């Protein structure tokens, strides 16, 4: 068995961030009466949020903004799309979002089944996530994922972000693993795939949405059940 340790990303890989965020944002839309403020319809509000969230996460990954800026500025920029320049409202929406998002528990299809399968085969299962420490732990507990992982490495605990090599080195040390017997599984081409490749680690691109890329990960899958063909 070449691999002994499997390091998973969480958001967009196992935990369905977009689906869970949509539910949470629907609640925010209603709670803050955004329709009455001119933020309408929700069908426009939601894609604007996803757009700005992606941009700001990318900036956060590169160290251009802080986690706190990411949290409220994604709301702020979304409101600006509707000509609402209300920083106080954006920060209140952000705080409420961070409170309700982690209790959502939608996972990608067959997440639990594949984790059961891998655990049964005695692989060491771990997480490497750029998500916020408290939030990620809540997501894991509320979705029933926490018992599967021996080590949960967050950017806050390691003081480093994927794709930086330091977070992968920290993960190896924490798990007592070696790059040669470990593999990274994730959806983000920059953070997970480039990060692992630059660290000298094999990787699996979990390509749920069929993104094209010139990168050459060790494996590419479009569905978690395909891991049964690898391990």
Regions found by a protein language model. Give the residues of each.
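Short, intrinsically disordered/low-complexity patches at protein termini
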Residues: 33, 38-40, 82, 111-112, ...
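Catalytic-core regions built around general acid/base machinery
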Residues: 110-122
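Generic recognition of short, well-ordered alpha-helical interface segments
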Residues: 70-74, 106, 113, 166, ...
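N-terminal helical cap/lid subdomain that shapes the substrate entry/recognition surface
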Residues: 2-108
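Asp-based, Mg2+/Mn2+-dependent phosphohydrolase catalytic module
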Residues: 1-6, 19, 116-119, 128, ...
